[in-house]
Amino acid sequence: MKNLILMIQFFTRIPINIEIDVKEDSFAKGISYLPLVGLIIGGFNAIVYFVSSKFILGTLPIVLALLANTIITGAFHIDGLADTCDGIFSSRKKERMLEIMKDSRVGTNGAIAIVFDFMLRYAVLNSLNKKYIIIALILSPVVAKTVVTLLMCFSVYARKEGGLGGVFVGKVKPFRVIVAFIISISIGYVLIGYKYVALLLITVLFIEIYKKLIYSKIDGMTGDTLGAANEIAEIIFMLALLSFKGCGLL
């Protein structure tokens, strides 16, 4: 339970004022609970959408749900996406890319990434009916948090010095990833059945491609690239869900 609380405190802005004795391996042990953290985030976003759609017509409830996601996560992962795009697409050497990613200022590539992140989410959600908007809002953070555990476990840390990503990358044991996937599949099966597994695997495939791109640039993962992976995974899952719905598979 302490590790779950630690993960909620780390990945969300939910005010849980409980002091936890954090050890060096506490974060790595807690990743098994990341799908549950995703469920909390997704559940909050879905509630905001559902309640607001009862009183507001049109697409504004979708915008409010996206705003809710930004608030509950503190824009934690989208900041990583912006930093990653600024660094990776800077056409510099590895060391300079890592320096750029560490810069708190948002560059052109980062700004474009943020805009397209929200545009893609909005476009996909606006293409779904109310039922599947709620499903997408709930499950996309669950899938993303699940898939990112693979990067934490089977990657090396790109920076020589420490950083937020360093408490996860290369520190996670495989069985904790297995537990995370079991929890994730259990959640997804309740909502959309066995087809969740197919959507999860599609997301894994695209994140593996993303990993190869990052490795070709900086030879490893950082906290920023993990955050970017989370954002990309959510969008990939939403796009896959929309495709399945369009093809009559859901």
UniProtKB/Swiss-Prot annotation:
Entry's transmembrane regions: 31-51, 55-75, 106-126, 133-153, 187-207, 230-250
Enzyme Commission code(s) on record: 2.7.8.26
Pathway the protein acts in: Cofactor biosynthesis; adenosylcobalamin biosynthesis; adenosylcobalamin from cob(II)yrinate a,c-diamide: step 7/7
Domain of life the protein comes from: Bacteria
Cofactor(s) listed: Mg(2+)
Statement: the UniProt record of this protein carries the keyword Magnesium: yes
Enzyme class, broadest EC rank: transferase
GO biological process: cobalamin biosynthetic process
Pfam families in the record: CobS
Subcellular location: Cell membrane
GO molecular function terms noted in the UniProt entry: adenosylcobinamide-GDP ribazoletransferase activity; cobalamin 5'-phosphate synthase activity
GO cellular-component term (any): plasma membrane
Membrane-topology annotation of the record: Multi-pass membrane protein
InterPro entries listed in its UniProt record: CobS
Keywords associated with the record: Cell membrane, Cobalamin biosynthesis, Magnesium, Membrane, Transferase, Transmembrane, Transmembrane helix
Catalyzed chemical reaction(s): alpha-ribazole + adenosylcob(III)inamide-GDP = adenosylcob(III)alamin + GMP + H(+); alpha-ribazole 5'-phosphate + adenosylcob(III)inamide-GDP = adenosylcob(III)alamin 5'-phosphate + GMP + H(+)
Function, in words: Joins adenosylcobinamide-GDP and alpha-ribazole to generate adenosylcobalamin (Ado-cobalamin). Also synthesizes adenosylcobalamin 5'-phosphate from adenosylcobinamide-GDP and alpha-ribazole 5'-phosphate.
Similarity-based family: Belongs to the CobS family.
Database matches in PANTHER family: ADENOSYLCOBINAMIDE-GDP RIBAZOLETRANSFERASE (PTHR34148:SF1)
Name of the protein described by the UniProt record: Adenosylcobinamide-GDP ribazoletransferase
Organism per entry: Clostridium novyi (strain NT)
